[in-house]
A protein has these predicted regions:
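Hydrophobic core segments of alpha-helical transmembrane domains in multi-pass membrane transport
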Residues: 8-20, 31-41, 68-73, 110, ...
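Juxtamembrane and boundary regions of transmembrane helices in multi-pass small-molecule transporters
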Residues: 24, 153, 157-266, 459-511
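Membrane-embedded alpha-helical segments and adjacent helix-loop junctions characteristic
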Residues: 51-59, 63-136, 142, 348-440
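Hydrophobic transmembrane alpha-helices that form the pore/transport pathway of multi-pass ion
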Residues: 101-209, 400, 409, 424-458
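C-terminal transmembrane helix pair
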Residues: 180-195, 360-394, 398, 402-511
């Protein structure tokens, strides 16, 4: 009975978005109301917990709103200044083939940004940029989200591992082994992601088959340095080093036609290639932003100083619920930094700035309404364990019930559970905090390695990023489309489940 009730919010999301194809701006308020009714009547959440979790959702909303607004505004400033045309021409000089461009942006660039910042930043940058290169909006979102998968395990300088596994009861040695095991499983699985990106933009044409070698090369250009970094340096740098390596290797391969198909597929036939030296000026704001993100995430002194400045609350209303906004550490601050550099560097006039700002607000307004209900629903589910009914929280009920039913076969569901956590919360780190201890406890019960189960949790929570509902809403906001969330979730759900099942099978066979 409890399991069926706990599944109601998830089933509703599936039915409303995927089966009935309602836009998220209509579907998510209904899911929110159903969840509110469920947690107040059956789980018996108190008013204090409702208020505290709502305020926590509010602070998270402010952070996401600023990330989305500044990302869209930065792209619009590039459009207003004409710099986007120079980037298009420079990319064409690497390769005019949109398949190569997809690997460069939706895979390698997204991985680098994920490694440095995480928190929805990669797709907020990549999706609108892909659209301006000619990619259809929905496809741009789908491939941007697929690309933001393998890198997520070590995203935001290793936060999903360092913070996410902190409550799993693992020793330091076990966490180190989890880092290595996760990377080794990801190593071949990344090919699923790059092949999926290629398939989305070419479908069943010859263009997909002839691009398979380059897709595999693109995956390995990231995962080989990523895995070596995880083995020798730990969880902070794999996605950053892998992303930089992939950008360089894919660019060189595209430029010198290594493994590229003879037939070139291009969305924009009229873009003329230019010398790569022309890309220097347009890239300066992006490079400064990326460098600042990498430095602030990996220089412990600066990291400590920036994160010490907080706006928020601790143990609100004596519920144990806390949240803080770190204004100089949040990714939105670095988007703002990039804009402050771009405006004088590109000579953007006040009229163009005002127009870009107005366009940006208009583009994201409906998605922001949706995001409010997504975050409220997620927080209510997350804190449903603080109740007067004596029940476990909604996510724990689901995890424990499935572990009880599946027994030793739970290992095949383990990464799917991690993906479910990310789908609800929008965060691999939070998914790991929610489920890693359950995964480890289940491993001990069924006689499986705790390290292996923790690794599958970390991998699954990364795969869940492909269809996490708040990531989908963020992506539709920055691209400016008002429907299609169900199609995006349906498509990426299939790829994420495939990724999860392949991870489980590989783990059983090799470890």
């Amino acid at each position: 009975m409890e399991l069926l009730l706990a599944l109601i919010p998830f089933v509703l999301i599936f039915l409303l978005l995927i089966v009935f194809r309602l836009p998220a701006v209509k579907a998510m308020p209904l899911v929110f109301l159903a969840t509110l009714l469920l947690i107040t009547t059956y789980w018996k959440i108190t008013t204090d917990v409702l208020v505290a979790s709502s305020l926590r959702a509010g602070l998270i909303f402010i952070e996401l709103f600023l990330i989305i607004l500044f990302a869209v505004l930065l792209i619009n400033l590039y459009k207003e200044s004409g710099m986007i045309k120079k980037i298009e021409s420079s990319l064409a000089s690497i390769s005019p083939d949109y398949r190569v461009q997809a690997m460069l942006i939706a895979w390698a660039f997204v991985a680098l940004i994920e490694g440095a910042a995480g928190f929805g930043t990669p797709v907020a940058l990549a999706a609108p940029f892909l659209v301006m290169l000619g990619f259809p909006a929905v496809k741009a979102i789908i491939i941007g989200l697929i690309g933001d998968s393998t890198a997520v395990t070590f995203g935001a300088a290793g936060t999903p591992i360092i913070v996410g596994l902190s409550s799993a009861g693992l020793s330091g040695e076990e966490i180190a082994n989890t880092v290595v095991t996760s990377a080794l499983i990801h190593l071949p699985l990344a090919i699923i992601a790059t092949l999926s990106i290629s398939y989305v933009i070419t479908r069943k044409t010859q263009g997909f088959k002839e691009f398979i070698p380059f897709s595999i090369f693109s995956a390995l250009a990231f995962t080989i340095p990523y895995t070596l970094t995880a083995i020798f340096l730990g969880p902070e740098l794999p996605s950053i080093i892998g992303g930089i390596s992939a950008i360089l290797l894919i660019s060189m391969a595209g430029k010198y036609n290594f493994l590229t198909p003879k037939h070139v597929l291009s969305y924009k036939k009229d873009v003329k290639p230019v010398n790569l030296s022309h890309i220097g000026k347009p890239l300066i704001p992006f490079l400064v932003m990326i460098l600042a993100l990498v430095v602030t995430r990996n220089w412990s002194y600066l990291n400590e100083k920036l994160t010490s400045i907080e706006l928020g609350f601790d143990n609100l209303l004596d519920t144990g619920i806390s949240q803080a906004l770190q204004p100089f550490y949040t990714p939105s601050f670095y988007f703002l930094l990039a804009m402050l550099i771009a405006i004088p560097l590109f000579g953007i006039k006040k009229k163009s700035i005002n127009f870009a700002f107005s366009e940006s607000l208009n583009k994201i307004k409906y998605a922001m309404i949706t995001l409010v209900f997504v975050l409220l629903t997620a927080q209510f589910i997350l804190y449903s364990d603080i109740n007067t009914s004596g029940l476990e929280g909604i996510t724990t009920v689901i995890a424990d019930s499935l572990a009880s039913v599946l027994g030793s076969n739970f290992i095949y569901f383990s990464p799917v559970l991690g993906a479910l956590g990310t789908f609800v919360t929008g965060s691999s780190t939070v998914s790991n905090l929610l489920f890693a201890s359950i995964q480890v406890d289940t491993a001990l019960t069924i006689g499986t390695s705790s390290v292996l189960m923790a690794s599958l949790q970390a991998i699954g929570s990364a795969a869940g990023n492909m269809f996490a509902i708040h990531n989908v809403v963020t992506a539709t906001a920055v691209v400016g489309i008002k429907k299609g969330e169900g199609e995006i979730i349906k498509y990426n759900l299939f790829i994420a489940i495939l990724y999860c099942l392949a991870a489980a099978v590989l783990a059983v066979l090799l470890f």
